[in-house]
A protein has these predicted regions:
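Short acidic/glycine-enriched loop/turn segments that link adjacent beta-strands
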Residues: 1-2, 34-36, 68-73
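Short hydrophobic/aromatic beta-strand element in the GNAT-like acyltransferase core
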Residues: 3, 24, 74-76
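Active-site beta-strand termini and strand-to-loop segments that position acidic
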Residues: 6-11, 77-80, 90
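Vicinal oxygen chelate
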Residues: 40-81
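N-terminal beta-strand motif that seeds the catalytic metal site of vicinal oxygen chelate
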Residues: 37-44, 89-92
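Core segments of cupin and vicinal oxygen chelate
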Residues: 1-22, 56
Length: 92
């Protein structure tokens, strides 16, 4: 995944803001997406476990787990109502 970091202020080695009041993040080109608007992304301890739980409860995986730079992993799921939700797992 080609990911570009965006910083609005001073940044620590982790990519997080090193001073209060700034928002850092990143951008990537979306290839195909089931979502037509903004996507809520939730931080989870384990994407693998979250994907299993979503599927067990009737949801589906839209985009499987994939690395994002050296920062972590992302995946996208669809719930039983058709909402697409992003998952984020920080690399450890």
């Amino acid at each position: 995944m080609d990911y570009t970091m965006v910083a609005t202020g001073p940044t620590a080695d982790s990519g997080m803001p090193s001073e209060p009041g700034f928002i850092n993040g990143g951008m990537l080109a979306r290839e195909e997406s089931a979502a037509s608007g903004p996507v809520v992304v939730m931080d989870v301890p384990s994407i693998d476990e979250a994907l299993q739980t979503v599927e067990r409860l009737g949801g589906s995986t839209v985009v499987p787990k994939q690395p994002v730079g050296g920062m972590g992993f992302t995946a996208y799921v669809k719930d039983t109502e058709g909402n697409v939700v992003g998952l984020w797992e920080t690399a450890r």
